[in-house]
Amino acid sequence: MLVMAGLGLYDERDVTLKTLDFAKKVDKIYAEFYTAILTGTTMEKIEGTLQKPITVLDREKVEYETNKLIDEAKDKDIMFLTAGDPMVATTHVDIAVEARKKGIEVVIINAPSIYSAIGITGLQLYKFGKTTSIVFPEPNYFPETPYDVIKDNLKLGYHTLCLLDIQADKERFMTANEGLDALLKIEEKRKENVISEETEVAVVARAGSINPGLYYGKIKDLLNYDFKSPLHCVIIPGKLHFMEEDALKYLFENI
């Protein structure tokens, strides 16, 4: 049996009772934290909560040695843990599908993810369009996909959730400041008037924690603002309903 369980967003207290129950029964627990990470806790605390040791797998082992994990689940009960919800990342979906192809029982335990946590903004979830990711620019690598996604969503009046790059192995987490700066750099190159320093955006910091940060304002006023510890994400609002306008006014710190 393969149990795919999410750990939630912030700390070990996000672990569900269902996950705790299955953790007691399984033979071995694996986890990956390269797609996302819980910044409010430590591996020791997670292991203490589950009362079992956890073997952490790096990107290469998850993406290129998936069969080893799946084959082990033929004869043993294996738990695979991820931050957020276990079925958000395409890689995790592939693991579940391949396991089922081999006749292995798959149990999926859902958990809070950024897609549920953005409800804290008061923006209507059904008005979000395609999600995009802003990555750290590298030499000869500066994808403009986020710009195109935002442009297409705005045409339809949709909000855009921009996830920010995580390089957990380097303990490097893109800040909202860096994400906004990247969007302005793409605009400077494309000149299609999708984003400007006058564009009003929302920033969510430490979603899922007891004290998340909610900030709203023009990009020019947010570029040098201290959003404090990660993880951050950026939302480019589309057409706003009056209730959403009230949410941005009263639920957010307006910069």
UniProtKB/Swiss-Prot annotation:
Protein keywords: Methyltransferase, S-adenosyl-L-methionine, Transferase
One of the Pfam families matching this protein, by short name: TP_methylase
Binding site residues for S-adenosyl-L-methionine: 9, 85, 88, 113-114, 164, 207, 232
InterPro entries membership: 4pyrrol_Mease (IPR000878), 4pyrrol_Methylase_sf (IPR035996), 4pyrrole_Mease_sub1 (IPR014777), 4pyrrole_Mease_sub2 (IPR014776), Dphthn_synthase (IPR004551)
Pathway: Protein modification; peptidyl-diphthamide biosynthesis
Key word Methyltransferase present: yes
Gene3D superfamilies (UniProt xref): Cobalt-precorrin-4 Transmethylase, Domain 1 (3.40.1010.10), Methyltransferase, Cobalt-precorrin-4 Transmethylase, Domain 2 (3.30.950.10)
Top-level EC class: transferase
SUPFAM superfamilies given in the database record: Tetrapyrrole methylase
Substrates-to-products reaction catalysed: 2-[(3S)-amino-3-carboxypropyl]-L-histidyl-[translation elongation factor 2] + 3 S-adenosyl-L-methionine = diphthine-[translation elongation factor 2] + 3 S-adenosyl-L-homocysteine + 3 H(+)
CDD domains for this protein: DHP5_DphB
Enzyme nomenclature, EC number: 2.1.1.98
GO MF, one annotated term: diphthine synthase activity
Family membership noted in the UniProt record: Belongs to the diphthine synthase family.
Listed PANTHER family: DIPHTHINE METHYL ESTER SYNTHASE, DIPHTHINE SYNTHASE
Subunit-level organization: Homodimer.
Function: S-adenosyl-L-methionine-dependent methyltransferase that catalyzes the trimethylation of the amino group of the modified target histidine residue in translation elongation factor 2 (EF-2), to form an intermediate called diphthine. The three successive methylation reactions represent the second step of diphthamide biosynthesis.
Protein name (database record): Diphthine synthase
Organism: Methanococcus maripaludis (strain DSM 14266 / JCM 13030 / NBRC 101832 / S2 / LL)
Gene: dphB
